[in-house]
Amino acid sequence: MDHSGHGMDMDLPPFTLGRGLQFSADPFFLIGCVLAIGLYAYAVLRLRRRGDGWPPGRIVFFVVGVLSIALVMCTKLNDYGMVMFSVHMVQHMVISMLSPILLLLGAPVTLALRALPVAGRGRTGPRELLLKLLHSRYMKIITHPVFTIPLFIASLYGLYFTPLFDFLMGSKTGHIAMMVHFLAVGLVFFWPIMGVDPGPHRPGYVMRMLELFAGMPFHAFFGIALMMATTPIVGTYQHPPASLGIDALSDQGWAGGIAWAFSEIPSVLVLIALVFQWYRSEQRTAKRSDRAADRDGDQELQAYNAYLASLQARGQ
């Protein structure tokens, strides 16, 4: 497939990590990354000027999440991803699974709700619009697991095993739209599972773990399908430039291995985050119970002991 419409030199030298990490910004994603960090920093500054704090860990997570997008979209990895299936798969896995998790751990919605000013009575400002969106029927639908899990799976099988992938890769606009789609799908999939930001759905911890593991095996199956294929699956990568010195089928096998192996990394990250949240939730519950006991003299325990004493008296 001709990629000259992307404005890239098709005679790329053989891929190395050093060459792949050279700066080569996509204007759309470069501007988006700069804006994201700028707006986040502005919101944090508003809180601090007001005398409120914001956890440094959340700042680190969000910034690293944005930088992970820049890493795969504003370097030569983006150029090599147009002609090498394996490099494209790295982009896909990072921008759809790793970046969303890091961004969500930064709690951008919570930050926005705290930083945006409350509009006057009877008025609608940005904060009120955001709250309305969060509680809208549309948001309830697109964050429900009945929608997010099939969408997460379809972004693999419905894209790579149909002509849609070749169509999107045929233009710069299509390629950008595909990458934005990957990021959006990752965000709506992991948002209710992570449970860091407020949203329409907040299932229990066990249910969130089940939702996480419901989608992950399909990544492994997809990777295995690529590795076991005896012919190139997508037309875009059937004839890589001779200057790369690679075989299309071998490169596809590497892409499958990346998809298979990478699915484990986000699962572990999210599982650690969920266990930590669960532990902190139990701690808060225990502290509330202790405070209640201190206030009422632990009447609940006294009532239970009295009940046991009455049972013992009846038995005598």
Please identify what each model-predicted range represents.
Residues 1-316:
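Alpha-helical membrane segments of multi-pass proteins
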